[in-house]
Curated annotation (Swiss-Prot):
EC number in record: 1.14.99.-
Species annotation: Staphylococcus haemolyticus (strain JCSC1435)
Keywords: Carotenoid biosynthesis, FAD, Flavoprotein, Oxidoreductase, Virulence
Pathway: Carotenoid biosynthesis; staphyloxanthin biosynthesis; staphyloxanthin from farnesyl diphosphate: step 3/5
Single GO MF descriptor: oxidoreductase activity
Catalytic activity, reaction form: all-trans-4,4'-diaponeurosporene + 2 AH2 + 2 O2 = 4,4'-diaponeurosporenal + 2 A + 3 H2O
Residues engaged in binding FAD: I8, I9, G10, G11, G12, L13, G14, G15, I16, S17, A18, A19, I20
Entry's family note: Belongs to the carotenoid/retinoid oxidoreductase family. CrtP subfamily.
Any one of the GO BP annotations: carotenoid biosynthetic process
Xref: InterPro entries: Amino_oxidase, Carotenoid/retinoid_OxRdtase, FAD/NAD-bd_sf
Protein name: 4,4'-diaponeurosporene oxygenase
NCBIfam families, per database record: crtI_fam
Function, as annotated: Involved in the biosynthesis of the yellow-orange carotenoid staphyloxanthin, which plays a role in the virulence via its protective function against oxidative stress. Catalyzes the oxidation of the terminal methyl side group of 4,4'-diaponeurosporene to form 4,4'-diaponeurosporen-4-al.
Cofactor: FAD
Length: 502
């Protein structure tokens, strides 16, 4: 294959994945990232003996990452160590009940005094339902990288498509049809956290997230998630990708509906045959291609930002024995919590909190007798009238109050290190649209759960990867998006070659 030039804007997991696959296919690939690390939101904080994953903390579907190494006849295990966690996470509820989530249902029954045989049987039936949706989506959405409802209907047929994704149900409606216990409903509904959305608004097709985790397991990257990003960076370099960190792309140059190259922050121009943007779609169109405010507003009506977060990294000089590696402290009213975040657009009164304590699996992540707590409640993305510092401060107190009331006794007294990220920090560091963490919200009414297509509808050689495009947010999905974009570009090149011979 001729050495066509490809520029990757941004080195998140989608960008580095696309870079690797395109380099493996023989393209001349250059990747530019404004930050000084590869991995995007897979970022790292190490201080005073504590280690924190600043972004994602859970690895699922590791085979998607392993495939990148396999294409080069290499094995991921030679680059990074991952460990399967039998106890996937622990859920705490306001009445004192605790439910441990195991991938083995018999183990889950034996470990949870609050669950009955009927509960486990209902869960088994629900997982059978979710598996059918998972298998249906594997054939077109994942395997072929289909981007639109019309493409899926064309491939699968109308009636089969409607039935295959339980089209007329939301995720929570589907869960509630099978599960009677409210706490199990809340726990399963919060799998929607992977895409920063509401289970009451998201389509039922996203129940596949639950089956994926049960089938593929939940994994920990030894030493922290950033080790996986470092492994991918090493593979990219070995495949010949030219990686330029600390270099920002300021604009994209065009000729009618064709991209000719990019302008860097040092004023230089770099030409390319294809551009793959790992920046979110709307920031790319708004900031690099200077779309009008009216056009951006039209796009956001369909592709609204997903949730952001108020992220607290706490180093504490106490060990909390009741915590697992991954923990969820649930709101007393999950439906209200979703409504406040996704509809009222306010800081929730009683948030559901995700709490990571990787020290439970990896003692190197905190000094002896200490723990590294990452605390993440979802909050709205940046609004036209942003929250004030006082509002964030009040919210911090509510979060700490909830943690202490639900078992983290005297937490405030034991905090010896604290680092906080608001949506403004997320937007400034990663360039995400309005500080969203998960790209585009999955909403049955707005977009049927679909995100932007991976190929631009305005430019013939511009592609996108990451959480704002299909197949969606979360580490494995954004990584898969990079591989799917590489497949699309390869297909285009094959078509060009074939056409030129005719």
């Amino acid at each position: 294959m001729s050495q066509k030039k490809i520029i990757i804007i941004g080195g998140g997991l989608g960008g580095i994945s696309a870079a690797i696959r395109l380099a493996q296919s023989g393209f001349d690939v250059s990747l530019y990232d404004k930050n000084n690390h590869i991995g995007g939101k897979v970022n790292r904080l190490e201080t005073e003996g504590f280690g924190f994953d600043l972004g994602p903390s859970i690895l699922t579907m590791p085979y998607i990452f392993e495939n990148l190494f396999n294409y080069s006849d290499k094995q991921m295990k030679d680059y990074v160590t991952i460990e399967r966690l039998p106890l996937q996470w622990r859920s705490f509820f306001t009445n004192g009940e605790v439910i441990d989530l195991y991938e083995d249902l018999s183990q889950m029954l034996n470990a949870n005094t609050y669950l009955t045989n009927d509960d486990i049987q209902q869960l088994h039936q629900f997982l059978n339902y979710a598996e059918k949706i998972h298998r249906f989506t594997e054939k077109g959405y994942f395997a072929l990288g289909l981007d639109k409802v019309s493409e899926i209907i064309k491939y699968q047929g109308l009636l089969r498509s409607l039935k295959g994704v339980d089209y007329f149900s939301t995720m929570q409606q589907a869960i509630n049809r099978y599960i009677e216990k409210q706490k199990l409903r809340d726990m399963l509904g919060y799998f929607i956290k992977y895409v920063g959305s509401s289970s009451y608004d998201a389509p039922a097709v996203l129940t596949l997230l639950i089956h994926m985790q049960y089938e593929q397991g939940l994994w920990y990257v030894k030493g922290g998630i950033h080790k996986l990003a470092q492994a991918l960076e090493q593979l990219a370099i070995e495949e010949g990708v030219a990686i330029h960190t600390g270099m920002d792309v300021c604009s994209i140059d065009t000729y009618f509906n064709h991209i000719t190259g990019v302008r860097l922050d040092d004023g230089s121009h770099v030409s390319a045959d294809y551009i793959v943007s790992n920046r979110e779609v709307i920031p790319t169109y708004r900031d690099l291609l200077h779309f009008s405010n009216k056009k951006i507003a039209q796009l956001e009506k369909v592709y609204e930002p997903a949730a952001s977060g108020y992220v607290m990294h706490l180093g504490v000089d106490k060990e909390y024995a009741q915590l697992a590696h991954h923990n969820f402290l649930f709101s007393n009213d999950s439906k209200r919590n979703y409504r406040e975040v996704f509809h009222d657009k306010v800081l929730p009164q009683d948030p559901t909190i995700y709490l990571v304590n990787s020290n439970k699996s990896d003692p190197t992540q905190a000094p002896e007798g200490h723990e590294n707590l990452k605390v993440l409640p979802h909050i709205p993305y940046i609004q036209n009238q942003p929250f004030t510092e006082e509002q964030y401060s009040d919210f911090r107190e509510r979060v700490l109050d909830k943690l202490e009331k639900m078992g983290l006794t005297d937490l405030r007294q034991h905090i010896i290190y604290e680092d906080i990220w608001t949506p403004h920090d997320i937007e400034r560091t990663y360039g995400s649209n309005k500080g969203a963490i998960y790209g585009v919200v999955a909403d049955k009414k707005k977009n049927k759960g679909f995100k932007f297509p991976k190929q631009s509808e305005y430019f013939d050689n511009l592609f996108f990867v990451g959480g704002s495009v299909n197949p969606g947010g979360g580490m494995p999905m954004v990584t898969l998006s990079g591989q799917q974009v590489a497949d699309k570009i390869n297909a285009l090149e094959c078509k060009v070659t074939t056409d030129s011979r005719e």
